[in-house]
Each structure stands twice: as C-alpha cells, then as structure tokens.
Design a protein with these regions (language model features):
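Acidic, glycine-anchored loop motifs typical of Ca2+
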Residues: 43-53, 428
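Short, acidic Ser/Thr/Gly-rich low-complexity loop/linker segments typical of extracellular
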Residues: 49, 55, 62-79
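Binuclear metal-dependent phosphoesterase catalytic core
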Residues: 341-433, 437-440, 492-495, 503-518, ...
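Aromatic sugar-binding surface patches on proteins
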Residues: 207, 458-492
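Glycine-centered loop-to-beta-strand initiation motif
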Residues: 37, 70-84, 135, 485-491
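N-terminal active-site segment of His-dependent metallophosphoesterases
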Residues: 30, 34, 116-196, 283, ...
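Extended active-site neighborhood of metal-dependent phosphoesterases/phosphodiesterases
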Residues: 104-114, 119-125, 193-290, 307-324, ...
C-alpha cells in the first residue's frame, strides 16, 4: 500500500527521528530515478516491442501518484522509487495482456530488494530498473453497452470453500457475456496462499478479472501499511489503479489502512486512503471528462473511510460518479448526503454489494452440501451484474444457485385467524430494493396497495436463526445475529378475508426501472389458532 504508518514508543523516538531522516534522504535519492518505456500495439501478440509495431500516443501511465501521457512516439517518463509499481491506465478500445488466470497484467513492479520477510511470500527482488518498461496493448471492440460481474467477499478459508464458490456461482456463470469481472475485496480469508486457487477457479469464466484488496487479503505481520500488500502485489499488481472500458472510467481503490497503535505491538486495520492515493485519484480524474461516468470500487464502504471527506472534495463536483464496496456482508443502496459531509448537488450513490460468501459460508447445507449462508439482512448470497449504456447504469442482484427472477422473499404466517388478519403483517424483502423503490401488494384479485418500507430485522432471517439455533450437533457454523435490512417492506393483510386459501401477490419497481414479482399463499381459518398452527 502507498501509505506509510510508523508506530514507535517514546523510548525509541530519537532513533525513529534518525531513521526517518535517513529514509527521507533515501527517498530523495530514489525519487531521482526515472522510468521510461513505450506503450505500443503488440500486433503479433508476443509481448515484445518489435520493429514496425505501432507506438501509441496519449496513453496514461502512472507511478501510483503522478500520471503522464505517452508522446507521439509512444514513449513516457515517470519518477520511481525502490518501491514503485508503474502501470498503464487501460484506454477504451484496448486490452492489456492477461496471465494464465485471466488477471490483467498492466503493470511493472519495481522492487530491487524484493519484499521483506513475511509469512506469505511477497515480491521477489526485481533487480535494477530496466532501461525500458514497455506496455503492450491489443485492440478490442468495446461498445457503449456492456456489463460487468461484481463479487463481494468470496472469502474462502480453504480449498473446500473455494469449491463452494466454484459450484455455487462459477458454474452458472461459465459462458457469460460480461466484459469483465471484479472481486470487491476479501478475495480470501486471511490465508493468502489461497489467492492462486481462487484465481484459477474464476479463470474458468474466460473474462478479464480485476481485484480490489480487502482487510482479509493483507499481510498481518507487516510492520506498516506500506508493506501490508506485498503478497497481493505479487499476485495482482498495484492495490489501486484505474482503467477505461467503453464510455466508463473505473477507479480501483485500496481503503484498507494497516497500522500498529503506539505501544500495542499488534496491528489492526481501519478504513483509510492516505494522501498519496487521494493525490492519485485527483490526478487521474483531472484527465477524465465530466461527461464520462466514473465508478469507484473499494472494499470498506465509503461512509466508513476515515479520510473520505478528502475524497468527497475530489469527486463531488462530478455529475456522473458512483461507488461500490463490499465488506459488511449485506446488500444496500446508500445515498450519501450533506449529513455525512457530502457537498455535491445530488446525493452520491454508493452500493454495498451482496457477498458471494453470504454470512461467511455459515448455516445449514443445501442439497449440494453447500451452506445456504444467507446474509444477516435476509439477502441470499450471490453477486451483482452491473450494466452500462454510455453514462447510464443499472444493477441487478443474482442469488447464487437460483433463477434470475428470484428477487424477493415474502414472509407471512402459514395460517392466520380470520379475526387477526388485519393485524397480521406481510413482510417482503426485495433484495436489490432501496428507498427509491416502489413495492405494492394485493390479495387475490384486489387492488394494488403500496407497502411501507421499514428498517428492521427481516423476520424470515430471524426465524431461520432461531430454528437452526435449536439444533444440536450441527456440522456447520452458526449464522450471525440478524441485522436491520434497508430493503424490507410490510403491509397488514386486509380484513374480512374468508376462511380458505388466499394468494398474496407482490410487485416491485426499483430505482433503475427493473420490475420483479413474487407470490405466497396464506390460509385463513375461523376461530382461535392452536399454539402450533403457524
């Protein structure tokens, strides 16, 4: 990571000051190094710049802070230190090379001495700065209409859970027409040796796959934040970067700050970006037209990032900007306003994406021996598909292993006393719903009636937790405690329902105009219910 965090006791302060002075002197020397190279059309696909291959002008290249453009000869120059990743900002209509796991290779990691000793292997020594760091690009068709797949927190602990992911989501996505995919952090669950197994599985989709760093993807034995992404860098390159696809500009952010509190000797993480990364975003967006949609992708939700106000100042004047995260293992559309310090003309749309792992692969197993792992807000585990059309976008939630039209869960008792029908609420969890959704209910062929949005625990999830909690000798991990859902609606049944079976219909229209529906049958009886009637 590009932020430096130094934690020392008072007794070591004098030594620290001397060390800092030496580091500053070293940085001053290192900053005089200049990387140079050519960005070119690799016509024969061999990954090498050959005679006659066309240099590409106007292509952006970055060192993680500064951004320069290639000249008419395709050449760039940019400053580097002994811990710099030089990378190309993929332009629209071009692709970068892909490795054997379909991970984009758009960078050169310059680390002459390699990573420090860590539990999980970092970057091997790269030696002296090459005379020319060249970046091959390949032309590809990128229409204004395209879609991408978003994975929140797959978070496998081991190979068994990598297999869960393979069977639960990868198999149904093979053959996708998505242009690329992104994992929004927590690629794995602390064991960084699982990066490779997870990447191999996702590679079967056959599309480029980008990665965001999460708090479970870092080196916990790192001495500071700057060294906490060494293993991530070895596998995936820079922890923050940007690229264009179609008419959209994507910015991947590293908002995991690793620090060691004074005197504690034990590291921890918090949401943070740091000055260098914010400077990169500022420099990056200065080269992006206002009419181009910008999509920020991160792990920790934006509202939980400590220096988010600095980022707000950079993006809030842009008319077209959204952000997407994971981390919290629920699904939510958040609209950031002045209540959180946002000063833009319109609220900022931030999506907290559903997680592939749901509730960390917990709960009873289904008929495939995969935990149902429902999120604590009642959202099924799964992923999102984000669609773009120029500067317009829409988001669809896809529940793992379910039909695409499974977009809601209706909770109502099996049986209700006729006398209590008007006092009995029907709840519907519209998984991708928000405060901008319209949700209505009717019973039988009655009138459609608007439902009321309510921020509370999903009673359906509460019932599952209660039911599974009573079991003994469970071979699975318990579900987490319920958390309030932001996409829950309720409405009481109408009065006067006759004894018999009645059909509840629900219809919903979300903020993107996407429609979904569901139904449930409830039985009405005369008289009092027995204690076990429902």
């Amino acid at each position: 990571m590009r932020r430096a965090v130094l934690s020392l006791s008072v007794a070591l302060m004098a030594a620290a000051l001397l060390a800092v002075a030496r580091l500053e002197s070293q940085d001053a020397t290192e900053s005089k190094q200049t990387a140079t190279g050519i960005v070119y059309h690799d016509a024969n696909g061999n990954g090498k710049l050959d005679a006659g291959e066309k240099p590409l002008s106007g292509i952006r290249v970055s060192n993680g802070v500064e951004i320069t453009k290639t000249d008419s000869d395709g050449r760039y120059q940019i400053g580097v230190t002994d811990d710099t990743i030089v990378f190309v900002v993929k332009p629209s209509g071009w692709r970068t090379p892909l490795d054997e796991n379909n991970s984009p290779v758009f960078y050169y990691n310059h680390k002459p001495q390699g990573s420090p000793p860590l539990k999980y292997k970092g970057v091997a020594p790269t030696g002296e700065l090459p005379k020319s760091i060249d970046f091959p690009l390949y032309p590809q068709d990128e229409p204004e209409q395209f879609k991408a797949i978003l994975f929140g927190d797959p978070q496998p602990r081991d190979q068994k859970e990598v297999d869960y992911i393979a069977h639960d989501v990868i198999e149904e996505l093979v053959g996708t027409d998505a242009s690329f995919g992104v994992t929004l952090g927590d690629i794995v669950f602390d064991d960084l040796n699982m990066f490779e197994a997870q990447a191999r599985s996702i590679a079967l989709l056959g599309i480029p796959w980008y990665n965001v760093i999460g708090n479970h993807d870092i080196n916990y034995d790192a001495a500071n934040d700057r060294m906490s992404d060494e293993t991530f860098e070895r596998h995936f390159g820079p922890a923050y970067y940007s690229f264009d696809h179609g008419k959209v500009h994507f910015v991947v952010l590293d908002d995991i700050e690793w620090y060691i509190p004074d005197g504690s000797g034990k590291g921890r993480y918090r949401g943070g970006l740091g000055k260098e990364q914010i400077e990169f975003v500022k420099n990056d967006l200065a080269l992006v037209p206002d009419e181009q949609l910008v999509v920020l992708m991160m792990h920790i939700p934006l509202v939980d990032v400590e220096d988010r106000q600095e980022l707000y100042r950079v993006i809030e004047k842009r008319p077209l900007c959204i952000s997407i995260s994971g981390h919290t293992h629920h699904h939510e559309h958040r609209f950031i306003t002045k209540a959180d310090g946002w000063m833009g003309a319109e609220p900022h749309h931030h999506i907290i994406n559903v997680t592939v792992s749901g509730s960390w692969w917990s709960g009873a197993s289904d008929d495939r021996s995969i935990p149902h792992t429902m999120c604590a807000d009642g959202t099924p585990n799964g992923y999102s598909i984000i669609r773009f059309d120029g500067s317009d976008y829409s988001l669809e939630l896809k529940a793992a292993g379910r039909a695409a039209d499974f977009q809601m869960n209706i909770h109502a008792p099996e049986v209700v006393s006729a006398a209590d029908s008007s006092k009995t609420d029907v709840f519907v969890n519209v998984f991708n719903g928000s405060s901008r959704s319209k949700v209505e209910m009717r019973v039988n062929d009655g009138e459609w009636v608007p439902m009321t949005q309510t921020i509370q625990n999903d009673p359906a999830f509460e019932l599952i937790v209660e039911t599974e909690g009573k079991l003994t000798g469970k071979p699975w991990r318990d579900l987490p405690k319920p958390k309030a859902s932001t996409h829950l609606w309720k409405l009481p049944l109408p009065s006067g329902l006759a004894a018999g079976s009645h059909l509840i219909d629900i219809r919903s229209t979300d903020m993107f105009g996407q429609k979904s529906s569901g139904r449930r049958i409830v039985r009405i009886v005369e008289g009092e219910l027995s204690p076990k009637a429902d």
